[in-house]
């Protein structure tokens, strides 16, 4: 029946397979089965998330987030005390995330020596030990330099192990993944006007960078290269998320319709 077909989609099958695997492994460990037969189960391929499931910040939310880190708006008194000591660091972290779509570990592993400002580039340490030189734009160069020059602790105060680490905690150690994640959650939650626990992860800022680049007009293959996606189908998810963008642009790019911005300008 249709009901049976519906219930046996790949997600349902994966759940059922998991339950059976647990049962058979239990029986095997207890000597009730001679062989562990779960090794012969065929893998079940689960579908990639649908485009409408992609969560990211909208442009106005990015603007709000950057305003928060700039001015401290929306922070509690306790958060503001902390922010006064880390605002340049926090700003540099957020700007790098939304510009380059860095993975959490890629940002965490950045060193001062990763940056060559005279050549206008910096080194990213990708997955699987891959190193990639990336051009640094003016905004990113400015926020990173401001942090290094005006807020980062002096070398004499930093332990040998963390001398080269770019982003340091107040304890003068390389920031942990958790502290970076909490930082991003805090600022994004204020931007989205939600509770701190519902703030976004660094991966959502990666999604924000990808969709924003595609909206700006960069090709899927350019974005794939910048984001280091293994497969272009991953990048296409972000493009599909904004599938109506071209229609919106074209409808607004209308010289003859008096209700569009261009039409109004022409008739002024």
Where are these regions (language model features)?
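Conserved catalytic core of the tyrosine transesterase superfamily
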Residues: 1-268
